[in-house]
Amino acid sequence: MIIPVRCFTCGKPLGHLYAVFKQRVLAGEHPGKVLDDLGLVRYCCRRTLMAHVEWIDDVLIYEKR
């Protein structure tokens, strides 16, 4: 739900890269190339960004009022 700030496995900071990654992928670039350009070579870091799903908008409709 919340963007990953650090890689869950190795602890590398990723929060500052997520907005760039998302913007470039939505623009049509291949995710693998974007991750290469961002300098993410470890598969654990790549997995953390690629597997993230933003569910916050879906969850907010169930907010207790």
Swiss-Prot record:
It catalyses: RNA(n) + a ribonucleoside 5'-triphosphate = RNA(n+1) + diphosphate. GO terms for biological process: DNA-templated transcription. The keyword Transport does not apply. It is an enzyme of class 2 (transferase). Its EC number is 2.7.7.6. It is found in: Cytoplasm. Keywords: Cytoplasm, DNA-directed RNA polymerase, Metal-binding, Nucleotidyltransferase, Transcription, Transferase, Zinc. PROSITE patterns: RNA_POL_N_8KD. Binds 1 zinc ion. Zn(2+) binds at residues 7, 10, 44-45. InterPro entries: RNA_pol_su_RPB10, RNA_pol_suN_Zn-BS, RPABC5/Rpb10. GO terms for cellular component: cytoplasm; DNA-directed RNA polymerase complex. The keyword Glycoprotein does not apply. It comes from the Archaea. Gene3D superfamilies: Homeodomain-like. Belongs to the archaeal Rpo10/eukaryotic RPB10 RNA polymerase subunit family. Part of the RNA polymerase complex. DNA-dependent RNA polymerase (RNAP) catalyzes the transcription of DNA into RNA using the four ribonucleoside triphosphates as substrates. This is DNA-directed RNA polymerase subunit Rpo10. It comes from Pyrobaculum arsenaticum (strain DSM 13514 / JCM 11321 / PZ6). The lineage of its organism: Archaea, Thermoproteota, Thermoprotei, Thermoproteales, Thermoproteaceae.
